[in-house]
């Protein structure tokens, strides 16, 4: 519907012509446009079709073998098998020369561009064999490489940034240890405090709000602490715990550090299973990634003690990768039919693994040297249901806990297997002796826990009924069978925690929250038996001087917190902390002193006692003085507040007298006061008696 023209514009031809004239958008004469099309229409030009459209899903694979036509089909099957893991392949072209021989490269088209990018990410630098390593690039990258300027321009000099001292925590002259305490302030929001265990009261170093979404974890040598977030994980370090590196891996649930802190492994869920990524900690670069079937695959990688190798178990094989290339050792896996478990020695490049029984062939435990792949010891085992491998921390001994059965019962389809008449063997391998002799200890009761003394030659076992178990201590010596040195009967413990320095052990019941502290060199006397109701964790400090028990809000929601004890079980500190979730001592790197120097210090330790005792007295005196000064300051603050309020009370006296009928009640004596009793009816009830 046309709009009626207003009367203001209906009076003359001049007005009509001005009203109907269209506006002029032309540039004035001599106008210079200083705005480029990219600035004005950058978002639209970014969507402009280009010559490369349609080839984003094509990759170029270089350095493939040059083969004759008779071997081409075999080459195609090998390459298709590798590249089909990244997506659906639409077309493959292998250029050939006049004789029909391949030219050493191929063009591969995927269904989607994202699949092509995944192929470049996973298979670039993939080593096919000794002489061929793939170079995989997107077809669209050629344009990028063509536009490289011919004239080299030197990079701009970046200003030097002072790096954090990552090892300042071990420079404390009194060698006080550090620990962190985590408490959940809200959902997916955890506050973490860092403390130094100074006597007589710990010193707070740093507190971070919203530091992590779930929990934290120290690296093996205490250099870094890792935090978890939705986009990935980050590591922090230095005196003020600054961010050192971040690793983007969405939904990371678990991480592992290599023993020397060179690499980090992150585990995160995918729609089909778990994705595992190995990162270089110093550069933040992704070294290799894996996809595992199933959502509960955690800690599937095992590192050698020196970070030279990392291994994982496959179907009837062990895959050992060399660092830093992360290629398979000798470019192939180690085939071991029936393998069920393996573990690295904590001090040597030796792998221990066990194989299940197959077709009347007994189970077997094998020691293998790496990288030679030479088997140094085999031990056959019969009637085996399961095995667990336990290395002593110093690598001197290996204990294999063998679950054995007297009778095997199978159903008709052999899908359900029941083991009857269970008993247990402990096979002790003497790793430092010639030909690795093996001793055996048999126990006919249910095994609840096993633990090696970290430094020493003893191990302990909890066996029997859970509510009335026995704790046995065995000693291992050269040339003789392991001997039972002590048995503590009728103990209600479920876990064993040795001191990192040996000698002392905590027998814990993490169901009831009871603990017993035992000295293994003093006839296994129980020095203390404290309780910490609902405690769910026990943490020794790295020096073996203190023990912490904690009640985490992951287990219960009330009375959460932690207790700190001496190695003899004497309580030092009780801390109640709402929504407490985690307590972790900061690990220490190994000492730089030689064994001879350590022995010399232990031998002459008595001459250091006077200096230590004097320092302790000074510290306690200083602490007492600081405590008295603090109390005096609090008293002065209180008296100042009290006098201020008394002054206000006196200033209000005239108003009080007026409000109280001009009677000064401030100075009334009790004898001048008359008591008046007033009674009134509150409630009346009538009860009929028969």
Swiss-Prot record:
One of its GO terms (cellular component) is eukaryotic 48S preinitiation complex. Keywords: Coiled coil, Cytoplasm, Initiation factor, Protein biosynthesis, Repeat, RNA-binding, WD repeat. It is found in: Cytoplasm. GO terms for biological process: follicle cell of egg chamber development; formation of cytoplasmic translation initiation complex; regulation of translational initiation. Residues 57-141 form the RRM domain. Residues 15-25 have a biased composition (Acidic residues). Residues 614-645 form a coiled coil. Belongs to the eIF-3 subunit B family. RNA-binding component of the eukaryotic translation initiation factor 3 (eIF-3) complex, which is involved in protein synthesis of a specialized repertoire of mRNAs and, together with other initiation factors, stimulates binding of mRNA and methionyl-tRNAi to the 40S ribosome. The eIF-3 complex specifically targets and initiates translation of a subset of mRNAs involved in cell proliferation. This is Eukaryotic translation initiation factor 3 subunit B. The gene is eIF3b.
